[in-house]
Amino acid sequence: MDKDNSVQEKGLFLSSWKLDNSKMAELFMECEEEELEPWQQKVEESQSKDDDDELIFVGEISSSKPAISNILNRCSPGSSSKGLKNGSFNPAISNIFKPTSQHYRNPSSNALVALPSFHPALKSSESSDGQTVSKLDFTKTSPQEDSGACSVSQSDSTQDIPSSNILQPRTGVDQTLGLKHPSTSKVNSVNPKKPKTSASISETRPCSSSSSQTAPSGASSQTVLSNVNTSSVQSAPGSSSLRSCPKCNVKFRLLDPLKCHMKRCCPDMINKFLETLKSENSKAVSKATTDSDKEKLIMLVSDFYYGRHEGTIEESQKTHTTFKCFSCTKVLKNNIRFMNHMKHHLELEKQNNETWESHTTCQHCYRQYPNPFQLQCHIESTHTPHDFSTICKICELSFETEHMLLQHMKDTHKPGEMPYICQVCQFRSSIFSDVETHFRSSHENTKNLLCPFCLKVSRMATPYMNHYMRHQKKGIYRCPKCRLQFLTSKEKTEHKLEHRTFIKPKELEGLPPGTKVIIRASLGSSQSRASSPPSSTIPSTSLQLSVPKSKSTTTKNNSKVSANKATTTSPQTVATTTGKPSASKPGTGTTKSKAKPSYKQKRQRTRKNKFSIDLKNLRCHQGSHMCIECRSKIKDFSSHFSTHINCDFCKYTTNCNKAFTNHMSSHNDHPSKQLYIFKKQSRARRGITLVCLKCDFLADTSGLDRMAKHLNQRKTHTCQVVIENVTERAVTSESASDGLFK
């Protein structure tokens, strides 16, 4: 008869389990939001796999509180008090209060009887919705109250409790049944036989009706319902990031829940706790600041990228050899004079030929430009006695801003790169003029002859002259990373191997791991960093030598400055589309219409930013990819397509940094802001005016192209060049009048 009743109770419990299965899923979803421990998540997986075959008991308890309180929370608030007064505990419930050794002494006898008692706990866990359920004070429970609990539990197991009778959860407050929490010491003194549990959801392993599966489930419940010390060991992996309450030692991952808990648990200790927390944070910030200052090194471009190596110091044998030029049959006394003579021959031939190429080739670096105007701009901005911070001394090219120079150095050159080599003594330098000066001073009165195009050394006059003249032909191979040009592809390939780090900068030796090196184009960029607009903070770049241990303050500041700009991998070195508008600050005479961009400008800017983001987020993992603009392999999309750049002198736009650099150097090598200095000097030396003899059209030296177009459109017109001697007074008055009209 007992077996039939137990089987009937089991069937009723299975039906209620099917009804509440959806609510059970909701319970576990909320448990996941509360960041369960790893051992709890593992039990949840086993429940989801075996919920069709086995019965599962899920209850939610708090730290050092009895687990039986969940069983009594299955009814409505009215029925719960009634059940305590009129009934006694179920024998199965009383077995839970026993130690684990007594609870599983005879598993086969109580396996089926204990099944209905698990169902109310399941209901209570569903009604709690992941919140901590309050615990009952069992010191006030009389033996008369214990007599009716069995009838209450059995009658509830045969009825379906509607969802309206289930206790609604209260977020953040533990007030179920309006009872008070007992402290840890009280629970241990009143219920000495109850097992201690941790502040998390404890679960009893599934148990079936067979006696063979009951014992393993008991063993698993002993592991879960263990003492506080065991549970603390299980949660040890995340204990480093947890903060505990100073009174009850309950641990929290976030600070706000801990504050709410301390307001209820120990309100008198919260102020002291917050002061201690602030002092710890301030110490940590100060330590991080000092560490970041120690782990930061600021270097200039000249110190980081440029270098010089003396080579083998051996005095070459002086032979006062004469050299004869077979073109003009002139005899030169030594090798240096013969080299200068060949250079003059080249200039004379260019003047006699009067070809277009002779007027578009730079006499210093032998680069060719589309027109004479761009050649003049290149000479005045690059080959000057003034040492500007926007000139790359390796390539001998000038850039518009310091940021463009830094981007060029990052993409093209290596630290301590010395591609210019003396083939006689292996003297190396990052600057071409250093090698040329070294050769003229150290190897004078020898048989060695230096080619100014490829630095090849010859020892005979005739082969040297033939080699010299072959460089004037079109079939030459230029190095894209320096000014050298070669006659064969093999020589160019061998030279490319020299574009590497030859000698590591001395400042980088012996640095601790994690040190960040900040490269600046000039010393002035660091001083104007705080007062200048955000675009002026761009000209500093950081090179991370190893994995950083702590984030430096410089990186944090630069990330804050560039927060409103396009997202890049290195925000300190990549130009943005908002750099030019930010260059003009309020107070420089700009009107409101200029300060506020129009709808069309905003739309174009949004479109450019969208293109930049799409290119940077592009990821292709299979095979190698080549950029169709610069014809180079793409290693990283985000750094290769850093931002959308527009040319100020033509309609050229691109997202490729290398393509834009090549465009500026070959097509639009225009003068920068410092070109105004040279215009003043040239105006002081000479005043040249072009006058059309048929009409009133006039043009100065800056309008040579306009005069050429004028004469081309009007075939019958002719012009005359008028050269005036401009005095210093005229230049001063002219500059003063320009200042008045501006």
From Swiss-Prot:
Gene3D superfamilies, per the entry: Classic Zinc Finger
Subcellular location(s) per record: Nucleus
Zinc finger (C2H2-type): 323-345, 360-383, 390-413, 420-443, 477-499
Predominant cellular place of this UniProt entry's protein: nucleus
InterPro entries to which the protein is assigned, alphabetical: DUF4195 (IPR025243), Snail/Krueppel_Znf (IPR050527), Znf_C2H2_sf (IPR036236), Znf_C2H2_type (IPR013087)
Name this protein carries in UniProt: Zinc finger protein 280C
Gene: Znf280c
Pfam hit, one: zf-C2H2_Z280C_D
Main function: May function as a transcription factor.
Species of origin: Mus musculus
Chain residue numbers at which the record places covalent cross-link Glycyl lysine isopeptide (Lys-Gly) (interchain with G-Cter in SUMO2): 10, 23, 42, 65, 85, 123, 135, 180, 186, 193, 580
UniProt keyword annotation of Zinc present: yes
Keywords: DNA-binding, Isopeptide bond, Metal-binding, Nucleus, Repeat, Transcription, Transcription regulation, Ubl conjugation, Zinc, Zinc-finger
Entry's Gene Ontology cellular component terms: nucleus
Listed Polar residues bias regions: 138-168, 182-191, 223-243, 579-592
Composition bias type Basic residues, residue spans: 593-608
MF terms in GO: DNA binding; zinc ion binding
Positions of region (Disordered): 138-243, 523-608
Compositional bias segments (type: Low complexity): 200-222, 523-578
